[in-house]
Amino acid sequence: MNKPKIFIDGEAGTTGLQIRERLAGRSDLELLSIDPVRRKDSAARAELLNAADVSILCLHDDAAREAVSLTTNPASRLLDASTAHRIHPDWVFGFPELSAEQPEKIRQARYVANPGCYSTGAIALLAPLTGRGLLPADFPVHIQGYSGYTGGGRALVDAHEQGSAHPSKGAFISYGLTLEHKHLPETMVYGGLTRKPVFTPNVGGWAQGMTVTVPLHLAELGVSAEALHAALKEHYAGQQYVKVFELADNPEILDPQTLNGTNNLELFVYPAADGERALLAARLDNLGKGASGAAVQNLELMLGLS
């Protein structure tokens, strides 16, 4: 039996490298590679995109769109890690835990869009609540994200790992202060929101690992923290990669690096003693469940390996 052929278009980048590392030791897949000197050669890329059973696009948005146009073989499937297609109607959103039907949608899809890292945490917290009517779609939501510097873009990665100059090197910074972060559209669509949330991303001096938090005033919702927690527990029951902590087991400190190197996602509900407030929190590796780990999970679904 022929092994499925996998091509990582953009394997030299952070996400591409990590996906390749996760797949390199597998005997059930054949990895196709492009000559490094031709990695921006459209003809060379097209040859591999059309030879592969699944190509994983680890590219900026415009290059990802180009890869789609280059893939003319109807039997070749695409898994896009960029933001280009996450809310496109022809693409299936690659968060298998979104619903009971989502894994099968991914299995059957020709085009799958891998979620963003911040949005993975936010959607994981919000979707079960909006879907059950506990959080109105037009509720004013505030989301805070705290990531290692790999979540802040190429300039920050280069500053920390290659010694290039950057004014925020080594510091804790808030960015995306226009409040129009690129993960907002998918967070709204798949988080079940009709009103734009206020989302503030932040990065620190560690390499990877993140937390995403959503503070809520419960009196405005008319629900308890226990009800929110029960909804999350019900939604993610039996999931391999998502764990909802019991209220009594919540850690006093959330270290964003705890899940580094894994495809795991942990969810927490922190109730205030007065019963009037709660903090929803998600913890994940921004390069794991937020990128390469999720890509491998989606790839396995697309190939019928899980």
Curated annotation (Swiss-Prot):
UniProtKB keywords: Amino-acid biosynthesis, Arginine biosynthesis, Cytoplasm, NADP, Oxidoreductase
Entry GO terms, CC: cytoplasm
Gene Ontology molecular function terms on file: N-acetyl-gamma-glutamyl-phosphate reductase activity; NAD binding
Pathways involved: Amino-acid biosynthesis; L-arginine biosynthesis; N(2)-acetyl-L-ornithine from L-glutamate: step 3/4
Entries under SUPFAM superfamilies matching the protein: Glyceraldehyde-3-phosphate dehydrogenase-like, C-terminal domain, NAD(P)-binding Rossmann-fold domains
Keyword presence, Transmembrane: no
Active site: C117
Gene Ontology terms describing biological process: L-arginine biosynthetic process
Domain of life: Bacteria
EC number from the UniProt entry: 1.2.1.38
Keyword NADP: yes
One Pfam family, short name: Semialdhyde_dhC_1
Catalytic reaction(s) noted: N-acetyl-L-glutamate 5-semialdehyde + phosphate + NADP(+) = N-acetyl-L-glutamyl 5-phosphate + NADPH + H(+)
Location within or outside the cell: Cytoplasm
InterPro entries: AGPR_AS, AGPR_type-2, NAD(P)-bd_dom_sf, NAGSA_dehydrogenase, Semialdehyde_DH_NAD-bd
Function in brief: Catalyzes the NADPH-dependent reduction of N-acetyl-5-glutamyl phosphate to yield N-acetyl-L-glutamate 5-semialdehyde.
Family: Belongs to the NAGSA dehydrogenase family. Type 2 subfamily.
Cross-referenced PANTHER family: N-ACETYL-GAMMA-GLUTAMYL-PHOSPHATE REDUCTASE, CHLOROPLASTIC-RELATED, N-ACETYL-GAMMA-GLUTAMYL-PHOSPHATE REDUCTASE, CHLOROPLASTIC-RELATED-RELATED
Protein's recorded name: N-acetyl-gamma-glutamyl-phosphate reductase
Species of the source: Deinococcus radiodurans (strain ATCC 13939 / DSM 20539 / JCM 16871 / CCUG 27074 / LMG 4051 / NBRC 15346 / NCIMB 9279 / VKM B-1422 / R1)
The organism's taxonomic lineage, starting at the top: Bacteria, Thermotogati, Deinococcota, Deinococci, Deinococcales
